[in-house]
Swiss-Prot record:
UniProt name for this protein: Beta-synuclein
Main location: cytoplasm
GO function terms (MF aspect): calcium ion binding; cuprous ion binding
Record region (Disordered): 96-133
PTM notes: Phosphorylated. Phosphorylation by G-protein coupled receptor kinases (GRK) is more efficient than phosphorylation by CK1, CK2 and CaM-kinase II.
Tissues and organs where the protein is expressed, per its UniProt entry: Highly expressed in the brain.
Protein source organism: Mus musculus (Mouse)
PANTHER family: BETA-SYNUCLEIN, SYNUCLEIN
Length: 133
């Protein structure tokens, strides 16, 4: 049972990390969009204020999206049976959890399951085929 709970805990951490990575990617995209829009706005007279406003709204929406992805990940984990809905924390902020996960060292290295090897298997030699004329 302890192994099962550890597996669920690792799955929860994975869901949280995935949600944070998604949020981080969207936030970075919003920042780049903001930079691009501000550059274009600086070349066009009279629209800089409106452009900055649009860029800031884009950044805010990226933050909201990250939170939605986090709660959606919890719903997916519950629907697949990985965790019970009531076990999934609802009061966590994705950015806080991801920061904690990044600061904690990995207790034990990830290992391959016994008997399984992920190395490339040797490829068979093939004879070249030459069609008859």
């Amino acid at each position: 049972m302890d192994v099962f709970m550890k597996g669920l805990s690792m799955a929860k951490e994975g869901v949280v990390a995935a949600a944070e990575k998604t949020k981080q990617g969207v936030t970075e995209a919003a920042e780049k969009t903001k930079e691009g829009v501000l550059y274009v706005g600086s070349k066009t007279s009279g629209v800089v204020q409106g452009v900055a406003s649009v860029a800031e709204k884009t950044k805010e929406q990226a933050s909201h999206l990250g939170g939605a992805v986090f709660s959606g990940a919890g719903n997916i984990a519950a629907a697949t049976g990985l965790v019970k809905k009531e076990e999934f924390p609802t009061d966590l902020k994705p950015e806080e959890v991801a920061q904690e996960a990044a600061e904690e060292p990995l207790i034990e290295p990830l290992m391959e399951p016994e008997g399984e090897s992920y190395e490339d298997s040797p490829q068979e030699e093939y004879q070249e085929y030459e069609p008859e004329a």
